[in-house]
Amino acid sequence: MAKKIVGFIKLQVPAGKANPSPPIGPALGQRGLNIMEFCKAFNAKTQGMEPGLPIPVVITAFADKSFTFIMKTPPATVLIKKAAGVQKGSPKPHTDKVGTLTRAQAEEIAKTKQPDLTAADLDAAVRTIAGSARSMGITVEGI
C-alpha cells in the first residue's frame, strides 16, 4: 500500500549549500520532517554541480514523517544571466539591452532545461529560452 501524502514543499536551494536555516528549516519543520536528513541527502546529490547554483526541489511529505524529493533543472533566468555575463536583467527589457546571447549558448541552455520544458523538440526549446532572454533585456543572435 502506498504511503499517505501529507503535502508538497517547493523550494529553491543553492547546490551543495543546504542547511537547516531558513527557508529550509521552517518549511520542513512545520511538516515534522527530519531537516538534517534532507540537507545531507540534497548536498550529496548536488555534489557534482556548480556550488551555489539555485536548484528547484519538490519535497513530498508523507504521513509517517518520511519524505522524498525531486530536483529540477536550474531556472532559465539564472543560466541565461550566467551565459550572457550579466548580474541582472534590464529594468526596461524591450528598450535597454544589457547583454547578448548567441544561438550556441541558447542551445546549451535549452539542452540543460529540456527535461523541464514542454517544448516538442530542441528548436522549440531554443525559442523558449530566446523568449526568456528577450524578456530580460538580453539580445539573442542567430534566432
Curated annotation (Swiss-Prot):
The record's account of how the chain is modified after translation: One or more lysine residues are methylated.
PROSITE patterns for the chain: RIBOSOMAL_L11
Any matching Pfam family: Ribosomal_L11
Record protein name field: Large ribosomal subunit protein uL11
Keyword Ribosomal protein: yes
Domain of life of the organism encoding this protein: Bacteria
Statement: the UniProt record of this protein carries the keyword rRNA processing: no
